[in-house]
Amino acid sequence: MNIIVGGGKYGCYAIEHLRQTGKAFIVVDTDIKCLAVKRFRLKMSPQASSDRESFVKGDLSTVLKLLESLKPEYVFPTAPVHIAADLARVKFNLEPHPDLINAILPKLPEVVVLQSGKGKLVASFNRDADCVEKCTMPKVCPSSRISKPCTMIELFRFACPDAFILISYSMAPGMGALKGKELLEFLSWVKTKEDFIVATACDCHGVLNAFKKRKTA
């Protein structure tokens, strides 16, 4: 089983890919009239079902429950969120930890830093241009013309070796997915931490979030 987070344009790409490869999936979206439901006539289910293809109306708390109960092969984060960070925020009582991000900034080339603040950093080898649709991630970026000296995954490992770095695996041109097993390992890892950095990256782009656990009374 696979989970697709978001039923928009990129969620539809994920459905097409999974159908072509004969893999089962559940789409999760807050909108029961999302593009994926309309285009693929997905059957709505109040929760995980035995159907090979289904739609569940829900938010990130729903995704977390499905992740923990189904232990999916892959999670396709097609919605505009940092899925690992947001799932941790749902599961644990967290607040941003900007100081950890500020400590990383000097270790990253300015040319790749797209956004930084409030405990979050976004980096890209294509900082100032739009990405090519369904890009194959060649060594020389077709938009910025930057020749990548390493992947963003490797750059993050250098800049923040203590972070939990999730890899966005290339499933098809322009489409990445996280391994369900690695997401679950991350959530188990967070249980042992008072503060931490989590990152998700592919060859070209990446996002980091820093958190600390709120003190309970």
Ranges and model annotations:
Residues 20-24:
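Conserved S-adenosyl-L-methionine
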Residues 7-12, 78-85, 118-119, 127-131, ...:
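Gly/Ser/Thr-rich loops at beta-strand to alpha-helix junctions
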Residues 114-188:
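A conserved mid-domain beta-alpha-beta active-site/ligand-binding segment of alpha/beta enzyme cores
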Residues 1-19:
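Glycine-rich adenosine-cofactor-binding loop
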Residues 182-217:
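Extended, charged low-complexity segments
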Residues 33-38:
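Short, charged/polar "capping" segments at the starts of alpha-helices
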Residues 39-44, 50-112:
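Phosphate-bearing ligand-interacting subdomains
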Residues 26-32:
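Conserved acidic E/D residue at the C-terminus of a beta-strand in Rossmann-like folds
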